[in-house]
Amino acid sequence: MNTYKNSLNHFLNLVDCLEKIPNVGKKSAFKMAYHLGLENPYLALKITHALENALENLKTCSSCNALSESEVCEICSDESRQNSQLCMVLHPRDVFILEDLKDFLGRYYVLNSIEEVDFNALEKRLIEENIKEIIFAFPPTLANDSLMLYIEDKLQHFHLTFTKIAQGVPTGVNFENIDSVSLSRAFNSRIKA
């Protein structure tokens, strides 16, 4: 026997897809699908077009691994930024969050994962940009502390100053879950790593 829900395969597929977005539960996914499918199909088409454009044009910067729509991102190509400081972050979204604070005017390096770090390219960049300080802007965890020590060890021959953002960022919490005042205070109170 066919049930009502079985007759709505496309709609339920949309709900399932939306539910896969982080922090979106079944009820929220249903509300979004209903709104996009019935109440505002024009918005659904705009979102579809925006997604297509983002997927076609979004890439990572060849210099710092941040999100970019060109080979080199705006931050790396901005000659007015300070070359002496390199802020290491774990994810491209962390660059967005730190840039919104407007507290850091240097350059970035997005790790993504330690396995992906091209230390030869990173060392070349340290020399070319005359980097004097590496700022670790990682959420405080034991794993991230180990990661900082590993990077310091790999780059010790450059005699850099290694600092990390101050505690005040709760342990185990991602940047997007921290208010901007706390994150700004922690960033400006960074300490030697």
Swiss-Prot record:
Recorded coiled-coil stretches: none
Domain Toprim, residue spans: 84-170
One term of GO molecular function: DNA binding
Keywords: DNA damage, DNA recombination, DNA repair, Metal-binding, Zinc, Zinc-finger
GO biological-process terms attached to the record: double-strand break repair; recombinational repair
Positions annotated as zinc finger (C4-type): 61-76
InterPro entries linked to this entry: DNA_Rcmb_RecR, Rcmb_RecR, Rcmb_RecR_Znf, TOPRIM_dom, TOPRIM_RecR
Pfam families: RecR_HhH, RecR_ZnF
Function: May play a role in DNA repair. It seems to be involved in an RecBC-independent recombinational process of DNA repair. It may act with RecF and RecO.
Family, similarity comment: Belongs to the RecR family.
HAMAP family in the cross-refs: RecR
UniProt cross-references to NCBIfam families, sorted A to Z: recR
Protein name: Recombination protein RecR
Gene giving rise to this polypeptide: recR
